[in-house]
Amino acid sequence: LQYMTDADAEAMAVYLKTLPKRDADPLPTSQARLQPSVMENGRKIYDTQCALCHGADGKGHPPAYPPLAGNQSITMASPVNSIRMVLNGGYAPGTKKNPRPHGMPPFSHILDDDEVAAVVTYIRVAWDNSGAPVAAAQVPELRKLLPE
């Protein structure tokens, strides 16, 4: 946004106002809470691989490390973005307010499909997040998209 002209920002605002409103009701509580073994495995992986940057409470350390607690992109109906971030990692662009962004490392070479599903499920339901659980069967299709 820092490189947009005022006219571009106004055009974007006008466009966004034309989009239909989303349902404001929270998603139903995830059934993952009923699967203690998945949640425990996901919590252990989170504690060892994610908590250093994103915090034990999921609040992160902005702007370098974004919060996962209450993060709408984590609780979207589709878990694709969350799975891909765990597999591929991610690197934010440098901006005026964040000139040296930190990146998230990929975990595709460390975690198997069950572990990816467990940690993503944990993140999607921990800290009162309201995302749905992720099945290990959802991971291989996205793993195939990894660059060689």
Task: Give the location of each predicted region.
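Flexible coil segments in periplasmic/lumen-exposed cytochrome c-class electron-transfer proteins
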Residues: 1-52, 94, 98-148
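A cross-kingdom feature marking solvent-exposed beta-strand/loop segments within repeated
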Residues: 1-3, 64-74, 101-103
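Sequence/structural segment immediately N-terminal to covalent heme-attachment motifs in c-type
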Residues: 34-63, 70, 75-88
